A protein has these predicted regions:
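All-alpha RGS (Regulator of G-protein Signaling) helical domain and cognate RGS-like helical scaffolds
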Residues: 1-167
Length: 167
C-alpha cells in the first residue's frame, strides 16, 4: 500500500480529537455519532463519498488523486471557515487543521509526481497559484498537542463532510 494513507490515518485521529474538543466546549452534538464511514445525513455527501471510493479503488494513482482532491477541498473549506469566525479557539483549530491538510496535499502531490509525472493532478478548488504555493513550499511544523488534548483534522472533509457523516 501507499504510506501516505497510513500516515494520514494517524494524524486524522488526532484531528478528530481537536474537533471533539470544540464540540464539547460549545456543547454541540457530534453529527457523526453513530455513523459508519461514508454514512452522511446529506445524500449529496454520500454520493460524493461513494464516487471517490470507487475512483480511488481503480489504481494507486487514482487513490492519490482522490486524496489530493479531499485535501484541496479541506483547505478551501477551512480557509472560508477561518474567515467566518472570531473565536480564537476555533481559529486555532482551523489553522492547525489547515496546516495538516497542506502537509497532506504536499505528500500526495510528491508521490503522484514520482508515480506518474509532473502534471498528474490539476487543482479543482484552489487556483493553480494557491496550489503551487502549497506544494512547492516546505512541510510545515506545528501541531495541536499543546491545547488540552486537542489534535488536528485535515482530510476528513473538514467543512463539507463534518456536518453529517464520517469520511
Amino acid at each position: 500500500g501507499l504510506r501516505n494513507f497510513s500516515n494520514i490515518v494517524q494524524s486524522e485521529r488526532q484531528h478528530q480529537r481537536a474537533v471533539q474538543g470544540l464540540l464539547q466546549t460549545y456543547r454541540l452534538t457530534d453529527p457523526t455519532a453513530g455513523k459508519r464511514a461514508g454514512e452522511f445525513t446529506d445524500p449529496e455527501f454520500t454520493q460524493l463519498y461513494q464516487q471517490l471510493v470507487t475512483q480511488g479503488a481503480r489504481s494507486n494513482v487514482d487513490a492519490l488523486k482522490v486524496g489530493a482532491l479531499i485535501e484541496e477541498l479541506d483547505i478551501a473549506d477551512l480557509n472560508q471557515l477561518t474567515r467566518q469566525t472570531q473565536r480564537a479557539d476555533i481559529k486555532w483549530v482551523y489553522t492547525n487543521l489547515n496546516r495538516g491538510s497542506r502537509n497532506h496535499l504536499r505528500s500526495f502531490d510528491m508521490t503522484l509526481k514520482r508515480q506518474s509525472g509532473a502534471s498528474a493532478y490539476q487543482p479543482q478548488h484552489l487556483s493553480q497559484a494557491e496550489y503551487d504555493a502549497i506544494v512547492y513550499s516546505a512541510p510545515e511544523r506545528g501541531g495541536m498537542g499543546g491545547m488540552g488534548g486537542m489534535g488536528g483534522m485535515g482530510g476528513m472533509g473538514a467543512g463539507r463532510g463534518a456536518g453529517g457523516g464520517r469520511w
